[in-house]
Amino acid sequence: VIEIGNAWNPGEPTYSTLPLETLLAFKNQCGLYLCQEFIYYNPARLPGPIEWVNKQRVRVKDSFTQIWWMSKTPHPYANNRNVAEPYSRQMKKLLSSGKYNSGTRPSEHTISQTAFSIDNGGAIPSNVIIAANTTSNDIYITKCKEHKLPIHPARMAPAIPEFFINFLT
């Protein structure tokens, strides 16, 4: 699992393709399979790049990065039950009533009458991980201060490794 932050081309308000090129190089040169792409959305991320977002106001805030899950095999171990989220109020109501509007959808998917009648203990999460990285006094910062070490300005939100450790082990 790798997260490569977004990159902007120097001196212009355009995205660099370097993160995508890096992904493809890892995949092709190492013989890896791209299992799934995730989006890490940080609602607390500061506006940037400053020149294009705040000063010239020709771009919007860059608030997400891609996380790529790669593997040496097309079928690596994973279990989405380990990262199930609480059911929504509507899903809980549906499970208790046992009634669902079954039939063919505009998408041409056919939903059976019992499709959503099984309580699986939680909802399958999406591939968008929303996590602010606003911790100002965690053990990392405490230890850095204690040992007079510089604090890295772009630390990963703890929710990211926690999700993948639970999902993939």
What feature does the model see in each segment?
Residues 1-169:
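Core catalytic lobe of class I
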